[in-house]
Amino acid sequence: MNSNVENLPPQVLRLVYKEVSALAADPPEGIKIYPSEEDITELHTSIEGPEGTPYAGGVFRMRLVLGKDFPAVPPRGYFLTKIFHPNVGHKGEICVNVLKRDWKAELGLRHVLLTIKCLLIHPNPESALNEEAGKLLLEDYKEYASRAHLLTEIHAMGGTSGAPQEPADGPQPKKHAGDPNKRVVGAGLPTMGTGTNNSNISNTNIVAKKKTDKKRALRRL
């Protein structure tokens, strides 16, 4: 997705930077902020699943994207962690009134994040993007909660904080060929057959020397 930094007026960028800095220094409870120095118009966050909900124990990564008309137009919100929720589409898009008709320029990003967290506590089946989840919420809450908790266990309980990071089992940097810590297999160990070869060479040299000495003796006669 293209950055909107160049499209936003300087005064808006200053306000966004100020608010993001404040959020990072003092985030709402259960929410972490991962600001990007390169693109302030795309804010990555993580939200802890609220206790007493099917999402408890999970950490859900999310991002807010500020368009070129922000703050006149609300930001767009996306869950990056897969979640079973009536108001979250299959591609992670979030449907909540504060990001649509109830948006006001003065609300700010903190209000948006708190509203999305509240959405995990009180889903709204009337504006469902995931119709299956919305139907189960209304007709069979036990099944809805079971499905939501299962996906939380699978996708949101990886033991990470939600921060973008490299996989622990990813490729590791190769050691330099001259690294003194790099151990060469077989280094310092006797090579099989070396002793035998040296012995054979020594015996050959002795036989050749004896033949030379014999020829010299015959010449003297």
From Swiss-Prot:
* SMART domains, per the entry: UBCc
**Presence of keyword Transit peptide:** no
**What's an example GO cellular component term for this entry?**
nucleus
Q: Which domain of life is it from?
A: Eukaryota
GO biological process terms, semicolon-separated: anaphase-promoting complex-dependent catabolic process; cell division; exit from mitosis; free ubiquitin chain polymerization; positive regulation of ubiquitin protein ligase activity; protein K11-linked ubiquitination; protein polyubiquitination; ubiquitin-dependent protein catabolic process
Q: Where is this region: Disordered?
A: 158-221
Q: Does the keyword Kinase apply?
A: no
**Compositional bias (Basic residues):** 208-221
EC numbers: 2.3.2.23
Q: Which Gene3D superfamilies match?
A: Ubiquitin Conjugating Enzyme
- Report which reactions are catalysed by this protein: S-ubiquitinyl-[E1 ubiquitin-activating enzyme]-L-cysteine + [E2 ubiquitin-conjugating enzyme]-L-cysteine = [E1 ubiquitin-activating enzyme]-L-cysteine + S-ubiquitinyl-[E2 ubiquitin-conjugating enzyme]-L-cysteine
* Summary of the function given for this chain in its UniProt record: Catalyzes the covalent attachment of ubiquitin to other proteins. Acts as an essential factor of the anaphase promoting complex/cyclosome (APC/C), a cell cycle-regulated ubiquitin ligase that controls progression through mitosis. Acts by specifically elongating 'Lys-11'-linked polyubiquitin chains initiated by the E2 enzyme ube2c/ubch10 on APC/C substrates, enhancing the degradation of APC/C substrates by the proteasome and promoting mitotic exit.
| PANTHER family recorded | UBIQUITIN-CONJUGATING ENZYME E2 (PTHR24067)
- Name of the protein in its database record: Ubiquitin-conjugating enzyme E2 S
Question: Which species expresses this protein natively?
Answer: Danio rerio
Chain's gene name = ube2s
